[in-house]
A protein has these predicted regions:
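Hydrophobic/aromatic residues located in beta-strands of well-ordered beta-sheets
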Residues: 128, 151, 201-203, 232
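Conserved Radical SAM active-site core
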Residues: 26-146, 150-151, 159-160
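Aromatic-anchored, glycine/proline-accented short structural segments
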Residues: 138-194
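Conserved strand-turn element in the central/C-terminal portion of the radical SAM core barrel
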Residues: 167-169, 180-214, 218, 236-237
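Conserved small/polar residues in nucleotide/adenosyl-binding loops
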Residues: 250-252
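Conserved radical SAM core fold
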Residues: 72, 109, 134-137, 155-173, ...
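Local cysteine-cluster metal-coordination motifs and their immediate loop/turn environment
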Residues: 4-17, 21-25, 57-68
């Protein structure tokens, strides 16, 4: 896989990112929007010191209700070299972050792997968390097997119609199921040290207004498939933002 024929995500744009943009609107140069110690992630990630988040610019999902649309859709951020990215990873460890959390990393996987190689050679040892929409290719996840400790995927939609309406991705439900299967295969059951997750999968689901039955289907699926072998993070902080402000169904 390379930037001149990009197939990193299920959109399969086949675009030359050195010259043009695909659905995610990202070039071949890594851009990041925010580096922080995040206190409000799941407690087993944030702990007392915070999760060392690195927010990447752009996104392959482009959900119409995105609460980070300035970063994901409008592309707020600045370019960094792979060497500088590796330094940022190490700086998060120096700040006593409990983990290094890569937020919306899918479209920069190739560069992130190179940066993680450099950082690990220089002593990066905290768990690396892959915070993703869940819209991932199994082949790309396989490339991450030696670099990611905790997968933090969304499971946004159960229905193809809902996925099409809100993210223009009708294949999302099938894709995310296969992706989570692969994530679990790669990291296995949850492992903890001092109440901080060292290995495992945490599945997030944001409950959308009027779509509670779909949420119930997702919870049922996760339980029947994984039982106690993954963690489920149900989120109720939906706020109508971005394009959702014009849609009566989810504008409350």
């Amino acid at each position: 896989m390379d930037m001149q024929n990009c197939t990193l995500c299920p959109r399969l744009c086949h675009v030359d990112r050195t010259k043009n943009y695909g659905v995610c609107h990202a070039s071949d140069k890594v851009e990041i929007a925010l580096v922080s110690l995040h206190q409000w992630e799941e407690p087993c990630l944030s702990g007392t010191n915070g999760a060392g988040t690195v927010f990447f610019s752009h996104c392959n999902m482009r959900c119409i209700f995105c609460q980070n649309h300035e970063i994901s859709t409008e592309g707020k951020g600045f370019p960094v070299t792979i060497e500088r990215l590796a330094q940022i990873f190490l700086e998060q460890q120096t700040r006593n972050a409990h983990c290094l959390e890569l937020v919306t990393p899918t479209h920069y996987v190739l560069q992130i792997i190179e940066a993680l190689k450099l950082a690990k050679k220089q002593g990066l040892s905290i768990p690396v968390v892959y915070n993703t929409s869940g819209y991932e290719r199994v082949e790309v996840l396989e490339m991450l097997k030696d670099y990611i400790d905790v997968f933090l995927p969304d499971f946004k939609y159960y229905s193809p119609d809902t996925a099409k309406e809100f993210s223009h991705a009708p294949n999302y439900p099938q894709v995310v199921k296969e992706a989570i299967d692969k994530m679990f295969e790669l990291v296995g059951k949850p492992q903890f040290k001092d109440n901080i997750m060292q290995k495992g999968v945490i599945i997030r689901h944001l409950i959308l207004p009027w779509y509670y039955k779909e949420s119930m289907e997702i919870v049922k699926y996760i339980w029947e498939k994984y039982h106690h072998d993954v963690y489920l993070s149900l989120m109720n902080q939906y706020t109508p933002m971005y394009k959702a402000l014009t849609l009566s169904l989810i504008h409350i």
